[in-house]
Structures are given as C-alpha cells and as structure tokens.
Amino acid sequence: CLACHMPATTYMVIDPRRDHSLRVPHPGQAAALGAPNACGGCHADRDAAWMAAAFARLFPGAGESRTSWGRAFELARAGLPQAEVALMAVANRAETPELVRATAILELGGFLSPLSAPALRAALADPSPLVRIAALRVLEQLPIENRWLAGEPLLADPLLAVRAEAGRVLA
C-alpha cells in the first residue's frame, strides 16, 4: 500500500518523507504534468508510457469520471483563460474532496468573470467551511458594496472560523 499510495521523497539526502494525500497514482497524468510518479518507485526500469498503459490495463476506467485536478491547477498557475472552466468543474463536483474544491475556488479568484460568478455564489453556501472560507477570500477582490451583498449572510455562519473570516473580509 505504501509504495503506491504514500510514496516517499527524500529531502536533503537523509530525510525521507511520505506523501500523506493517499491518492490513487495516475502515471499518465504524472507524465503529462511532469509530476512525481509513484509507479516509478517500483518500476524504475520502465518508461512513463509503459506505466500509463499498465495502469490503464490493470485498472480500467480509474479516474476517467473525474475532472483532472492537476490539469485545472496547471492551467490556472500558467494564467491560461481556459482555467476558469476547468476550475469551476473541479469546484462544482460534489465527490471532489473539500480541500481540493476550496483550492479550486481560491485559484478561480484569478479568473473572475460573469461566467464564474455562479460558482462563487455556490461556494459561499457550500456545506464545507473550507470552501466557504475560500470563497470569502476571493470576495476580497470585489468592491466593498458587492462584497457585502455576497458575504453578509456568512456573518451568521454556525462556525466561528467562517464568521471571523467574513468579518475580516467585510470590515
């Protein structure tokens, strides 16, 4: 389990640390994005194309139904306009982990437009406090009157952390 789902990276020659994200490795995506590839730990003698083909053969359909988080974040960090739609897809997918959805909302702040406004409004009402806080932080980019209209209901949020962030953003 550890080799695939918690691969170790050694820092400063003597400090191995395991990745605690517990994600399913995706060698094809890793090769496309230049990301670390957990499969390479055991199959160092094989190339990325072989690993991607073997993964697809062993686990057919794995990961096909979800939007590629890595691709969406890569587009965002490169400042490409198509990131807006990709980030909204990540943020709006209910089965995406809340930390990833919150990160997508934060990144969406760099691409705000009328197209992404509904995603931001939905994030302000999301069941996850992480997503609500991320949406509040994105509101900081708006003029105070728009900020107030969107964020004021969160001053009564049941969670103190959300209320505190709302107070900070709306002050």
Regions found by a protein language model. Name each.
Residues 11-13, 142-145:
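Secondary-structure transition/capping motifs at alpha-helix termini
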Residues 81-91, 113-125, 143-155, 171:
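Amphipathic alpha-helical scaffolding segments comprising HEAT/armadillo-like alpha-solenoid repeats
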Residues 107, 138-141, 169:
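Core register positions within helices of long alpha-helical scaffolds
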Residues 163, 167-170:
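Leucine-rich solenoid repeat scaffolds
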